[in-house]
Design a protein with these regions (language model features):
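A conserved ligand/cofactor-binding region detector
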Residues: 7-833
């Protein structure tokens, strides 16, 4: 009997998949790994056995892809990111192998529910927010489009944290996602590299009078990659995500242990372990800052070393490197790559500075993800110089030469130097270095890019206009429709064919069905089924009964003040007041659903979570309102529960302060699943509005120009708004009058103060919550009224889906390829393999 991998490879795509062979493979895996049969295996053991069977198939295609890359030697992008928020792999891999339904049926025949098996898989704790999810979507699209790529990141043992809610407060606990072993990774010790920290630099001159630099008395760790397969959709292409683990160079010291110095015996092991324990260690103290910088340098150095080793297998002249390699730096975290590539080229490859700089500046490109200056990373020079002494010297020289350029272009203009220098005021400004060295600098939505060019990075744009470009973010429809919402995916395929899976623009054909009562009813039934699924999840995890016939109004995203979860919950408080004052008011039942993690050291964000849960406790337990209003906070928001949430949402909350959100991608996932957006004209909302129009979104609030104008003029006074709006004033006062904190009236004082009183150098209501509140409440009232018109609402939902085509990450990646990376597709033929 042929192994499952061969059966699938040769037969599955022509619909002769053998369920019998697949089950035999699973059975053999259980026997060999656990000494068990299918009947007595645990759910976790079944997950592992099924995953190993699927991995067998992937391995053949992975090897074949690598052979093609070795043979054809195409240009490769190394996508460097601190985060990769991948989501569960089993279901997604089966979707991309075109095998999900067949495997589901095979498992059903032996009494195994594929959904229960999928629920055994942990979400790999390799990311946290939109930055990491974007990177994951990009990897999926690169493989599906057939472009050779490596993702480069860190194999965090515990992720950022697993969120638990206790008495309404966020509690951070380790996310031990590796405890049962992860089947979709492959340790590659043959590609380990040394990464050095600390010590000092010794200069010497050789007989030819050339300077040499050597790092001495350093500590080092070994970077060991674990490769994860990234499966392209139905094309045999499997790219690699290489996530780096840190291992000690010398390991356990038996000599120190025997001498009783137990701490010293494990010193090297602890140094290595600490590097990869958590994502974004708290940097409110020096040790946290040091650890973050070491993490960034660690994975960047290892990734560049592996990239150069791979390049040198095929080429001897490093001047060819820009023709074969591009390093895309996803945000500022990996931007130390500029100096590290220079260090390797100058110190280890012995290239002259000018040659090394020419190569580097044609190999590195930078994606900016933020408009907020405080999020553009800066390191104290003292820390940077102490931890990375030779790299700092490289940065110093890059800066010296660039400041000369500034002075030549703008003689005597110290303000330009202050804004643009890489080293200034005791800090290393990483974004500045990325812009100086990168041949491309891109924003992630049209509005974001324009603000960068005209505001935050205007001086750089004036000096290097040719570098700046826009690449509006996107999402992969394969995970967020095909896998997350199979009912809607099957319905769309019946209506317009399956081509949308690789060409999302084909969903535009659904416009023809937007006015059809039959299509509207079919869509409504699918939406309700998904709402029932989410209601069941909420009951199981929160113990709250929610009405699937209520409006599901959802805000799920990283908790940050500019995203204005506080405004959302203040509006819920406002609605509750209205219902209490007038129980017979015209109000369509509404369930407000939140999901968000707050950074461990972010006080106001954590207090906002507590407020949401306190409001939920009051409202959900008030029988007098007859269930008209419910509030739910979904614990530990992540990709796997996000898929359930997106499919069920009626209303998508995209309410950031205009000009603050670079793009957003949650907005696109909701749109793809037929939710209507309430939002500001910010980030990608602007482009969504251009696609679907004012009739199919609920836009409110100030424009980005208005916000920026107020910020520049310093003329906004939230107290005026507070004094002139009695209903809003009542809501704000409820933060401190005990309505939602009867045992501690001061519990939410910091949130109250943030709205009305200047705080530690920050203006009051920095994110214009009170300024936009009334406009927001009016837009919410429009939702209440519009939802009652079932036909109109369903038409708008269908038109949102029909206009989502632009927002596929396939489109985004093709633009990166055309304008920045200049890659060629590879073709992987499995015939005869």
């Amino acid at each position: 009997m042929l192994p499952f991998s061969a059966i699938r490879r040769n037969k599955m795509r022509d619909n002769t998949f053998s369920k019998k062979v697949f089950i035999k493979t699973v059975s053999d895996n259980l026997k060999n790994k656990y000494r068990k049969t299918i009947d007595d295996a645990t759910q976790q053991e079944l997950y592992q056995a099924v995953s190993e069977a699927v991995k067998d198939v992937i391995m053949d295609e992975w090897i074949a892809t690598q052979r093609v890359m070795d043979k054809d030697d195409p240009k490769v992008v190394y996508y460097m990111s601190m985060e990769f928020l991948m989501g569960r792999a089993l279901g997604n891999n089966l979707i991309n192998l075109s095998a999900y339904k067949e495997v589901k049926e095979a498992l059903n025949e032996i009494g195994v529910d594929i959904n229960a098996i999928e629920d055994q898989e942990p979400d790999p704790a390799l990311g946290n927010g939109g930055l990491g999810r974007l990177a994951a979507c990009f990897m999926d699209s690169l493989a599906t489009l057939g472009y050779p790529a490596y993702g480069c990141g860190i194999r965090y043992r515990y992720g950022m944290f697993k969120q638990q809610i206790s008495d309404g407060f966020q509690i951070e606990v380790p996310d031990n996602w590796l405890k049962d072993g992860y089947p979709f990774e492959l340790r590659r010790p043959e590609y380990c590299y040394e990464v050095k920290f600390g010590g000092y630099v010794q200069e010497s001159t050789d007989e030819n009078g050339e300077l040499h630099f050597e790092q001495k008395d350093y500590q080092s760790v070994l970077a060991v990659p674990y490769d994860m397969p990234i499966v392209g959709y139905d094309n045999n292409v499997v790219n690699s995500l290489m996530i780096w683990d840190a291992e000690p160079k010398n390991g356990f010291s038996l000599e120190s242990f025997d001498q009783g110095d137990y701490d010293k015996a494990v010193e090297q092991e602890n140094l290595a372990r600490n590097l990869v324990e958590v994502l974004y260690p708290n940097d409110n103290h020096v040790k946290g800052k040091e650890l973050r910088l070491k993490q960034q340098y660690f994975f960047v150095s290892a990734s560049i070393q592996r990239a150069l080793a791979r390049f040198k297998k095929h080429h001897s002249d490093l001047k060819d490197l820009p023709n074969k390699v591009v390093f895309q730096m996803n945000d500022t975290h990996p931007t130390v790559a500029v100096a590290e590539l220079m260090r390797i080229l100058v110190d280890e490859e012995h290239l002259p500075w000018d040659d090394a700089w020419d190569i580097t500046t044609r190999c590195v490109a930078y994606t900016n993800h933020t408009i907020m200056a405080e999020a553009l990373e800066k390191w104290p020079i003292e820390i940077f110089q102490r931890l990375l002494p030779r790299v700092y010297q490289i940065v110093d020289e890059i800066n010296r030469r660039f400041v000369m350029q500034i002075n030549e272009r703008y003689p005597g203009n110290e303000d330009k130097v202050r804004k643009m220098a890489i080293l200034y005021d005791g800090q290393v400004k990483m974004a500045n270095m990325a812009i100086v060295a990168g041949y491309s600098v891109n924003g992630v939505a049209k509005l974001h890019t324009e603000i960068l060019k005209n505001q935050e990075l205007h001086d750089f744009y004036e000096m290097f206009p040719e570098k700046f470009n826009n690449k509006t973010n996107g999402i992969t429809q394969r995970r967020f429709l095909a896998h997350a919402n199979p009912l809607l995916a099957d319905w769309a395929t019946k209506k317009v064919g399956a081509g949308w899976i690789t060409d999302l623009s084909l969903l535009s054909k659904l416009k023809a069905y937007a006015d059809s009562p039959v299509a509207q009813q079919e869509f409504a039934e699918i939406k309700r089924a998904n709402k029932v699924r989410l209601a069941k999840y909420i009951k199981e995890h929160n113990g709250i009964d929610v009405n699937p016939d209520s409006i599901f109004d959802v805000q799920v995203k990283r908790l940050h003040e500019y995203k204005r979860q506080l405004m959302n919950i203040l509006h819920v408080m406002y609605l509750y007041n209205k219902i209490k004052e007038n129980p017979s008011m015209d109000f369509y039942p509404r369930t407000f659903i939140f999901g968000a993690k707050a950074a461990a050291g972010y006080r106001n964000a954590k207090k906002t979570i507590k407020l949401i849960n306190s409001v939920a406790d009051v409202i959900n337990n008030d029988a007098s309102i007859g269930g008209k209003l419910k509030v739910v906070f979904i614990e530990d928001y992540k990709v796997s529960n996000a898929e359930i949430i997106f499919a069920a949402a009626d209303v998508s909350e995209q309410i950031s302060t205009a000009s603050k959100e670079a793009s957003g991608t949650g907005n696109m996932k909701f749109m793809l699943n037929g939710a209507l957006t309430i939002g500001t004209m910010d980030g990608a909302n602007v482009e969504m509005f251009d696609e679907v129009g004012a009739d199919n979104m609920f836009i409110f609030g100030m424009s980005s120009d208005e916000v920026i104008s107020h910020e520049n003029r310093h003329d906004y006074n939230p107290v005026d708004v507070y004094n002139n709006d009695a209903e809003l004033r009542k809501v704000v006062n409820q933060l401190v009058d005990g309505t939602y904190s009867p045992n501690d009236h001061e519990l939410f004082r910091e949130l109250y103060n943030s709205l009305l009183n200047p705080q530690q150098g920050q203006v009051a209501d920095r994110y214009f919550i009170l300024a936009d509140f009334r406009s927001y409440a009016n837009a919410q009232q429009k939702i209440n009224d519009y939802y009652k018109n079932k036909s109109a609402w369903r038409k708008s939902a269908l038109l949102n889906i029909a206009h989502v085509g632009k927002f596929s990450s396939d489109r985004t990646i093709q633009e990166y390829v055309d304008d920045i990376w200049h890659l060629d597709r590879i073709t992987v033929n499995m015939a005869g393999v």
